[in-house]
Amino acid sequence: MVWVREHNRLAAELAKINPDWGDEQLFQSARNILVGELQHITYTEYLPLILGQNYMGNILRNDQYNSSIDATVSNAFAAAVFRFGHSMITDNVSMADSACPRQTVMSQPLESVFFKPSLVTDPEKLVMSLAGLSHEVSNKPGPNFASSVNGKLFIHRESGATVGLDLVSINIHRGRDHGLPSYNYFRPLCGMRRAEKFTDLVDVMTQNQAVQLSAVYDHVDDVDLYIAGIMESPVFGSLLGPTFSCIISDQMFRTRLGDRFFYSHASSASNFNQGW
């Protein structure tokens, strides 16, 4: 909703500068600028917080568009790795006064707002929800998940349901549905030795976590990418372990340099000026 409002704001400003433009040109031009804003925020604010400077150095090591770079989204990134944010979900939804967003007006369990679109359709509730989100503190990425998404996801209390879906299970099965290789396949790709046994995993996680995996999986080659990746200890400067940090940095490097329309490329057709 924030981006919808920003798009409309941009369109209104462009209409002032270019009164002869029609609706379609205003829409598409505002869209181009909005994409540039999203790219800028992602690469200069979000990713540095998630990955740290070492991995950002890898992403930003080149600034020229390269037509030989494949910018498509990898299966591992889409079906597993970038869903690390699911572990950052909290159990409560805060609503705050937009004039003082740090002051919570109301907090309610996340599971209680499933199937209640009034949070976004009611203008007053929408503003309060956005204000609450602006200061809500997320959980750290890791193997611990909020109870609202652990067996209570999309639970519909009004229909008498007592059990919901499990987000972790969904993530595991999504990876299998997509035919993702196991976690062990990605270790050498990210500069680590392939594990021969569960105890070899202690180079990236605690001994207790390795034991937990051995109790669930028959062989270290069976471990799902999402599960082991989210269990890895964060590397220095990053919120994530080496495997997830590696796969995300590779994806973001290719997404940027393989996109001829990326906002910062000098040759991009999306380069902006005041009238654009």
Stretches found by the model and what they are:
Residues 1-276:
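Polyanionic, low-complexity segments and short acidic motifs
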